[in-house]
Amino acid sequence: MRPSKRRPDQLRSVQITRHYTRHAEGSVLIECGDTRIICTASVDEKVPLFLRGKGQGWLTAEYGMLPRSTNERMQREAAKGKQSGRTMEIQRLIGRALRSVMDLTKLGERTIQVDCDVIQADGGTRTASITGAFVAVHDAIGTLLRKQAIEATPITGHVAAVSVGVYEGVPMLDLDYLEDSRCDTDMNIVMTDDLGLVEMQGTAEGMPFSRNDLDMMLDLAQQGIRELIAAQKNALNR
Amino acid sequence: MRPSKRRPDQLRSVQITRHYTRHAEGSVLIECGDTRIICTASVDEKVPLFLRGKGQGWLTAEYGMLPRSTNERMQREAAKGKQSGRTMEIQRLIGRALRSVMDLTKLGERTIQVDCDVIQADGGTRTASITGAFVAVHDAIGTLLRKQAIEATPITGHVAAVSVGVYEGVPMLDLDYLEDSRCDTDMNIVMTDDLGLVEMQGTAEGMPFSRNDLDMMLDLAQQGIRELIAAQKNALNR
Amino acid sequence: MRPSKRRPDQLRSVQITRHYTRHAEGSVLIECGDTRIICTASVDEKVPLFLRGKGQGWLTAEYGMLPRSTNERMQREAAKGKQSGRTMEIQRLIGRALRSVMDLTKLGERTIQVDCDVIQADGGTRTASITGAFVAVHDAIGTLLRKQAIEATPITGHVAAVSVGVYEGVPMLDLDYLEDSRCDTDMNIVMTDDLGLVEMQGTAEGMPFSRNDLDMMLDLAQQGIRELIAAQKNALNR
Amino acid sequence: MRPSKRRPDQLRSVQITRHYTRHAEGSVLIECGDTRIICTASVDEKVPLFLRGKGQGWLTAEYGMLPRSTNERMQREAAKGKQSGRTMEIQRLIGRALRSVMDLTKLGERTIQVDCDVIQADGGTRTASITGAFVAVHDAIGTLLRKQAIEATPITGHVAAVSVGVYEGVPMLDLDYLEDSRCDTDMNIVMTDDLGLVEMQGTAEGMPFSRNDLDMMLDLAQQGIRELIAAQKNALNR
Amino acid sequence: MRPSKRRPDQLRSVQITRHYTRHAEGSVLIECGDTRIICTASVDEKVPLFLRGKGQGWLTAEYGMLPRSTNERMQREAAKGKQSGRTMEIQRLIGRALRSVMDLTKLGERTIQVDCDVIQADGGTRTASITGAFVAVHDAIGTLLRKQAIEATPITGHVAAVSVGVYEGVPMLDLDYLEDSRCDTDMNIVMTDDLGLVEMQGTAEGMPFSRNDLDMMLDLAQQGIRELIAAQKNALNR
Amino acid sequence: MRPSKRRPDQLRSVQITRHYTRHAEGSVLIECGDTRIICTASVDEKVPLFLRGKGQGWLTAEYGMLPRSTNERMQREAAKGKQSGRTMEIQRLIGRALRSVMDLTKLGERTIQVDCDVIQADGGTRTASITGAFVAVHDAIGTLLRKQAIEATPITGHVAAVSVGVYEGVPMLDLDYLEDSRCDTDMNIVMTDDLGLVEMQGTAEGMPFSRNDLDMMLDLAQQGIRELIAAQKNALNR
């Protein structure tokens, strides 16, 4: 049995709260078990230099953790004066994942700036960031549509992410911190609503994993993504 | 009448939620109107170099704003690679204010690290940080007392802070963002529960202010601080 | 009796030397007792981005200390690669204080860049910087008037600053380093020549201070500011 | 047909030159087609702080590109003052991949510091870095064994890496720059000599990829890794 | 006898390999004994701000060492986040030396960006960088001439550099690392092909040197420069 | 005739004021014509890591310019967050020059930290820094001798520095800013009182210089150094 007492294929409970803060065009609190992240999507009426004049938009993401979102207080990155490699890796992943369901030519010359800030961490912050940020982006696009700043939505489908892993030889879905820190393999999967693979990043922390392990993990991920996209749709319909 | 429709001497509604996040020894969400700040107090079992071996503790504070806590998205300080002068000024103020009610010799050689992170900003973030952080520190000290790491509380009294200002010639209590950006004088007052002055920082944004204005602002501040300390006590008794 | 042997209401001797260095439009050496600061005002024929095209000017200030201006050598901020929080706080204060007596719409689209560099420190460097920099700005404006770059002076009055404190229970004017490091309360007051309050920043280092202490400190400050503005006028008439 | 005229399952020609530079304990030039990388392994007789006193060793990696290793000159990271997110991501990957075949308890309290510096880039620099660095590490360990600094090798197997992708709908092995920049999916696979998966990082640049695509890519990768490990063994036997 | 067994006036063997890497307009590997440096010259179709619109070009240089190009691994400057004073000093020297034989008005509004990256160091890296970079610049200019981007070559002559020193009282040419670290005086000389002096930088590491020592060192340098320029010409004729 | 109306072999007037500021163990204002520099020498009772436990001392130097010491205001290096290549080059030169007349084994395990801060610049700031800093170091050593912290002076002789150049074909001594910016060759010479050469750094800004030019420049430098060392001795005898 896993430390969290969940079944191997059991997701943590997910809550997606829209309009969580007041200023952003899209603002979502996502809670996956004890992991809590504020995801905002801000509209910036310009594009980065490399896209200027090309008639298309951009989406980019930043990620941060409150210093005491974790069990041991981490040093504040703003005070240290630089973002860690882990932070950079995660924010690049979030950006790529969200762009995979955006037709940026329909956005016009503007940028959707996503911010994912972890209030409380219990594993899976990068995947929850993607799942939550999709809803925030959806709301920001909704604002643009209502203002008639764009004619059609650039969003081409849903995208969500979940972690899977091999814990004591058994493939498992949606690892919390304790499970993650003890597992042999840790993999993050990003999928669209038609179950196309957008990103997969797997690391064998201890033993290498086999292609059979991989298949079982992908089965679990597929099921988890389906539930997470259902939760996104649910939240967007409220 | 002021933009917020409040009376000149009327504080915004204050909510202090303890145990807001799970990991920190003290964790508080303070809400003053639309201003929402997470204040955590973490215990670090060492002191900075300049105090090592002196048999006393230390308390220090850091402050940050989520990029989209404000109306316009601000650049993330971690991404920019440095904290602004404003951030540094505020975190130094929070640290001094909280140390004013701490007998650090009773803390032992450990540091209370305070983090104030603004989730949503509507004026008065530095004063709300102080008011909320006091409660988080109180809870962190409580943890140390329960673990018998210290014998007696180092806390010597309550401390809270509030802003006052002169808006269209009339002194007013607890300015929100709109009031703050239009007022002539903006002053932040930090006081203890016996109404001793700990910090005062006043700036004439437009016209200089007179000693008479100052007196009226101090009267308002005194009343506001009383109410805020009552809210702190209330929260600590729950 | 105070360590400096001065009476509680006695300012240190003040010397203001204009045209101290050759290149700047305004260049002043101010000496307050053993505190010696070079204040220069440079004219830059452009404004920061946020003011471009608005038909008004700007004034900004920077502050630094020579590494061995103090008793213990401080690390050079340029070598460390960042300015301390204290430095940032002081230079923001100097800028605000000087802007309080400038009608920036009369300056045209140019910036007055003030630099205050402490050659020797003995307490009160931020207040002496303000008092000295005012004269440097006055000279820089004089250059612009003589060149007919502007038609009328943007300067609307004098501004000067002084510290006050409570030392062993007695309010005192213009603390030197020794007095400052032992006092209970330390307050910096910035006033105009009609004794309007522009900035006040008070900190209780030990015991909180009362409103009665505050009143006595303000009386002292008022008297000190009057003498400092007389010294400015004296220097400007030479 | 692919731009490089290779068959879909055809690796670029691989050259591994040992003892390429004189100072490092292990120094390898790896050439995969036009991609050329110097990989060195240096022995440092201490471990990072977090491992001090734990009786085990560490392996860490850094990665860089000469500014004109690419078609367009890139800004020198040392001059810019920071490493890009891409650089950090790659060097973290190289370190994890190499540690997967190291029993660090057999290394003693020392660190193997790997440096991978790209002299000329034509796609696949991160995977070639891993393949080449393994040989450099092997040589550095050889030095320690010959000096009898360690008793048994900490190396538990071979590790190598290769890229695979989907180019115009067809899965392909070992993409060069041109192929990489036009392909729909780009995946980097790290495997051991018993074909255990150590890392997989796949990104759909255009269309999401299916599990069937993934299977075909893994088949290709498996074959490529076999050939690369044969090349490593070949080089180590010379 | 000197540690390297060479005669006092004997240069190390020099190899200049053109077209060493594929992307740069000029790319040279220079080997002086065990010192090996990749020198590239890249053409950038713009000039720095201070030259914009002046109808002339610019040439600038950067210098770096691979972390393990030296006997002890050096910290990577990109990871440290800043270039050392030594690095800055060397790259400024390389730029000045190369500009001394360039008529920048004939280059048009473009910049030649030189990069000198030390693959293996054994003394004399800054002088070998200059000698090698000249050839790379020559090739980059050749590219511009062939493309008819410029009409006439901006190159006005050859430039090369060599070190001389006083080792155990005897002036010697072209010091390797061992000789350099033990010598009393270390001097770098940059000369044109008509033996005009462009740069000389001499440092007495131990005893000061006399004008007689200086004369003997200059005689040696003159001879060395002649041989190095012959090697440049040789390489350019191949 | 030269712009400054001086004869080719005429030094600017030199003033060396000791005890210029109060806190440093040695504090000197040196004025060479309009160039004015504060040179302080501070005693630090420890040595850098690389010398710890070796029973010898160290001397190091830092250099800075006040932002408006020059005709155009320069950006403050502390605000920019890094020192320029020029600054680093100069402070390394000052350190080497002063160490050339120090027997560091007689200093004990302490560091002399030299700071040269340019108050007003008119050419020759690096050479004046060396000449002035020698006197400050002499005073700091005097303090150590008086306190009997050391038994014998580590100072082995005088050191001073001067610039020479070729201006319109004529070698000249001690260039001011105007002369320096128009001259063909600019050379800085550091010599001891027995006229041993410690450093020479010459750059042909326009035409290369000949060995004959060099000889004439060295004759001028020799004479200038003699006068500067006489001024140092004079100041030290007052």
Curated annotation (Swiss-Prot), chains A, B, C, D, E, F:
It is an enzyme of class 2 (transferase). Homohexameric ring arranged as a trimer of dimers. The gene is rph. NCBIfam families: RNasePH. GO terms for molecular function: 3'-5'-RNA exonuclease activity; tRNA binding; tRNA nucleotidyltransferase activity. It comes from the Bacteria. GO terms for biological process: rRNA catabolic process; rRNA processing; tRNA processing. This is Ribonuclease PH. Its EC number is 2.7.7.56. PROSITE patterns: RIBONUCLEASE_PH. The keyword tRNA-binding applies.
